[in-house]
Amino acid sequence: MLSSYSMIRDSWKKLKKSDIYPVQKARMVSWRKSGSVVRLDYPTRLDRARSLGYKAKQGFIIVRSRVRKGGQHRPKIMGGRRPRRLAYNKLTVKKSIQLIAEERAADKYPNMEVLNSYYVGEDGLYKYYEVILIDRSSPAVLSDKNVSWIANSANKGRVYRGLTSAGYKSRGLGHGRLGSAKSRPSIRANGRLRR
């Protein structure tokens, strides 16, 4: 017999065939009307949140972050010139959309650190991620040996330095040496070294 977490995971893997699909469609309508960064009482995907380190205790919060889909546009060009020369369309950012969602959540809660994040849905315009944030000065966090490392000063602002899972992926790290020779010490520093 499957555990409850396994059943939740399986229903998210085959979302369109599962019982939660009508609920998810209704969520998309309400989520689009809500703000871009919204604090939640409990995670939408409990199995995923727990596997990434979430605990239902003081010092942990869940935030839903909304980010645009697709390529980036610069602000509209005003004045006479050729748009082609100003790279208005088809900009490919070097950060993943998930990392942008994490950074926006961290901007909204400056006293907290991003632990991790996971995908919860998308509609025609936006992608939605839930971000796990930890209060680095909470006594419950400081006394927990599994997460007290986040209070260390070396982990301050970790999301802005690409130290979360989404950040590692964007930097081309996380799969050993093979295929990441030009990613160390960082992409920018490696470019300087090769000049």
UniProtKB/Swiss-Prot annotation:
What this protein is called in its record is: Large ribosomal subunit protein eL15
Q: Where do the record's region annotations for Disordered lie?
A: 174-195
Q: Which residues form a coiled coil?
A: none
Q: Which family does it belong to?
A: Belongs to the eukaryotic ribosomal protein eL15 family.
Keywords from the named record: Ribonucleoprotein, Ribosomal protein
In the record, biological process GO terms are:
cytoplasmic translation
Where do the TM regions start and end?
A: none
Does the keyword field hold Ribosomal protein?
yes
Query: What gene is this protein translated from?
Result: rpl15e
Keyword Ribonucleoprotein among record annotations: yes
What's the short name of a Pfam family annotated to this entry?
Ribosomal_L15e
Which PROSITE patterns does the entry mention?
RIBOSOMAL_L15E (PS01194)
Q: Which PANTHER family match?
A: LARGE RIBOSOMAL SUBUNIT PROTEIN EL15, RIBOSOMAL PROTEIN L15
Q: Which SMART domains match?
A: Ribosomal_L15e
Q: Care to name a GO molecular-function term for this sequence? A: RNA binding
Species of the source: Picrophilus torridus (strain ATCC 700027 / DSM 9790 / JCM 10055 / NBRC 100828 / KAW 2/3)
GO cellular component terms listed in the entry, alphabetical order: cytosolic large ribosomal subunit
List the Gene3D superfamilies. Answer: Ribosomal protein l15e
What InterPro entries does the record tag this protein with? Answer: Rbsml_eL15_core_dom_sf, Ribosomal_eL15, Ribosomal_eL15_arc, Ribosomal_eL15_CS, Ribosomal_uL23/eL15/eS24_sf
Superkingdom, natural source: Archaea
Q: What taxonomic ancestry is recorded?
A: Archaea, Methanobacteriati, Thermoplasmatota, Thermoplasmata, Thermoplasmatales
Name the NCBIfam families on file: PRK04243.1 (NF003269)
